[in-house]
């Protein structure tokens, strides 16, 4: 079944909607999109799971809050990029970092002490999810 799904066939409905293979040209398009003047195009690059590290690092410093917010939402964003975003001036960006499942523990510690009550509440909420999982597994 796993091979059938990977080829876009089989009984799994998701198999019909698989993305095309990641190619050098797709990576080049993501790089180009990350440099576009339109922030909506850069947001799309920030949401990509396949962007190269240098793209993620550049987008973490993007002047547009929406671009940085999209990057903070990306579960594939590298830990160092999420650490950078955990210090962002935007409460919205920090809030999305707080609920990203890939954020490293040291960044979560920083966010736990954040000046924003919203960010602090999101950190507590995420911790409660982990506590609930521990109860289920016990």
Predicted regions and their residues:
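Alpha-helical scaffold segments
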Residues: 1-138
């Amino acid at each position: 079944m796993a091979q059938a799904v990977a080829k876009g066939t089989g009984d799994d409905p998701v198999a019909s909607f698989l993305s095309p293979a990641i190619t050098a040209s797709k990576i080049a398009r993501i790089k180009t999109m990350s440099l576009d003047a339109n922030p909506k195009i850069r947001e799309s690059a920030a949401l990509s799971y396949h962007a190269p590290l240098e793209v993620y690092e550049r987008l973490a410093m993007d002047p547009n809050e929406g671009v940085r917010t999209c990057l903070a939402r990306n579960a594939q964003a590298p830990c160092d990029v999420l650490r950078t975003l955990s210090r962002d001036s935007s409460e919205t960006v920090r809030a999305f970092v707080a609920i990203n499942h890939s954020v490293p523990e040291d960044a979560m510690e920083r966010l736990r002490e954040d000046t924003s009550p919203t960010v602090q509440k999101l950190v507590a909420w995420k911790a409660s999810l982990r506590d609930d999982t521990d109860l289920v597994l016990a």
